Amino acid sequence: MASIMGAVAAVKNNAASILDDHTIEQACYKTGYRFRRRILTPIVVIRLFILQVLHDHTACQAVTHLTDLSFSAQAYIQARMRIPLKVFQCVCRTMVQGLLQSTQDKSDAARWFGHRLLRVDGTGVSMPDVPQLNRRFGQPDGVKPGCGFPVAHLLVLVHAGTGLIMDIIASPYRTHDARQLTKLLNHVLPDDVLLGDRAFCSYSYLSLLLQRQAQVVVRAHQRLIVNFKCGRKSYRQLPKKQRVGAPRGRYIKSLGYDDQLVSYLRIDSTCPDWMPLAQWQQLPSELTVRELRYRIRRRGYRTRS
């Protein structure tokens, strides 16, 4: 796996070659944005904005010293505000794809045992208190009217080998991570390994990702009962009086200590509300899943399993 410092250095070295004038003009054309020829064209503004991001703690006033052009910080801010968000999104996606290809073509250092490793996780960001953002994203519970700030929920897909953010989905604050993952599945390719937390441990997502011939590594959901006893019976194999606390996964075989293969069955009554019942019924009726338990021991930290 490539280090973070090496990945950042590769991004800075390759960004200029990938982000040429034609790429930015194509992004403006695809999104329908028309502009006049002036000092701060979208080509100049977007390049300066990326330089501002890559250089830590660079204020807008310092951007004026990164080029030979003569303009003020206020003019740069206004020019950046004129560019639609769709143009930035199109340029970012083009840059990410180009940087991923440039790093993967040179060596296999960005892969984990030959697999492309992706990470998915959600977070929240606070935004300015304006009516449009309040209506779109909302505020946390318990905040008095007029006192809080709107908060957006972000679901991020990260390429672990380079640290590049492949895509971001912004949604209202009270949105669960699992509801938005389907919008990121187009980035998952066969033989990829997707790493997520327990929010993505569900039959629906395991099935959708396995249909794309990808591998999934997630933490077991807190409501999922796991039992590593060899030859134990599943929930459906026990009498009704003995089903309390029994695992629903059918035991197949043991692969070692705290390591086993189990079979999950699709149950129509557990269809998620975001998936149509017809699509749910088209998923495989049974999944073979590997369950294992390990402990992370770090000196000075609590042991987790």
Sequence positions of predicted segments:
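Single, function-defining residue in the core of a domain
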Residues: 1-57, 62-63, 70, 76-83, ...
